[in-house]
Design a protein with these regions (language model features):
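PRPP-associated nucleotide enzymes
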Residues: 1-319
Length: 319
């Protein structure tokens, strides 16, 4: 496996240690010994208990809830490794928070995604490995190389096995216009039809009207998005597909299960039969909703890490 004489070291913060353990098991190395904790006043503290001098270091930490704590853990881990003379540091961020704040929606708004993208570089990271950024152009916010893995192939494999030949009679539905490109690629891979839920207000102070563009009548549908946060949009879209479009059944999938606030209650009470999520965010976030099924991205991240370590192209992981 070693092609350049450097040791590979993998460490994790507290955001998603289960995923880090699974990745290490697949690669065949032990998770690095480190302690990531907080002082009484809330400051993050990192202690590395093994040498990283000259090593190729991978630091795994999603910037998920508690978002700011997870982010600071990652940044301080990067700094600790660079100050300990690590040869190269890759920040592995399966879920990159703040990505939705990627533009100025109104006057005097910050572009927080750009600010946060600067932080790993300022801390000393040499590369970022992430998955399904909310907008792919966020890769350009970083001043270091970024590998943005796609969850699409994982879902394609899952639904191809789940539904088999039935896929050709199903429809992929984008819950909004902004997700159409992502949903179209997914639909093409599975030879499914494509539909869009269009939300609009006809006049001021009127309720939002949900229109379904495309034929979903009598069809089994899959709602496809990059994340589920409070689940309001995806549950409303599912309701429109059934009540307005006349769909037979609705499944949903998303790369990142943020699942904030009323999300679990909304999913439990929705018409959605199953919600497939990737484990970029801890599976414990989905406890309380039996509809949720987690699919592991550890194999994809493990292969990406090995390829980066060996200086091999990761292009095959996008197919």
């Amino acid at each position: 496996m070693i092609s350049h004489g450097k040791d590979m070291k993998i460490f994790t913060g507290n955001a998603n240690p289960a995923l880090a353990q699974e990745i290490c098991k697949l690669i065949g190395i032990k998770l690095g010994e480190a302690e990531v904790k907080s002082f009484a006043d809330g400051e993050a503290s990192v202690s590395l208990y093994e040498t990283v001098r000259g090593s190729d270091v991978f630091l795994i930490n999603s910037t998920c809830k508690p978002v700011n704590d997870s982010l600071m853990e990652l940044l301080i881990m990067i700094d600790a490794c660079k100050r300990a003379s690590a040869g190269r540091v890759t920040a592995v961020i399966p879920y990159f928070g703040y990505a939705r704040q990627d533009r100025k929606a109104k006057s005097r708004d910050p572009i927080s995604a750009k600010l946060v993208a600067n932080m790993p570089t300022a801390s000393g990271a040499d590369r970022v490995l992430t998955m399904d950024l909310h907008a792919s152009q966020i890769q350009g916010f970083f001043d270091i190389p970024v590998d943005n893995l796609l969850g699409n192939p994982v879902f394609v494999d899952y639904y191809a096995k789940k539904f088999g030949e039935k896929c050709e009679d199903m429809v992929v539905v984008s819950p909004d216009v902004g997700s159409v490109a992502r949903a179209r690629t997914f639909a093409q891979k599975l030879h499914m039809g494509l539909a869009i839920v269009d939300k609009r207000r006809q006049k001021a102070n009127q309720c939002e009207v949900m229109n379904v563009i495309g034929d979903v009548e009598g069809k089994d549908c899959i709602l496809f998005d990059d994340m589920i946060d409070t689940a309001g949009s995806i549950c409303n879209a599912a309701k429109a597909i059934v009540e307005v479009g006349g769909a037979n059944s609705v499944y949903a999938c998303a790369s990142h299960g943020v699942l904030s606030g009323p999300a679990l209650e909304r999913l439990n009470n929705s018409v959605i039969k199953e919600v497939a999520l990737l484990n970029t965010i801890p599976e414990s976030m989905g406890e309380g909703c039996d509809k949720i099924k987690y699919i592991s991205v550890a194999p994809m991240f493990a292969e990406a890490i090995e390829r980066i370590y060996q200086e091999i192209s990761i292009a095959k992981l996008f197919n």
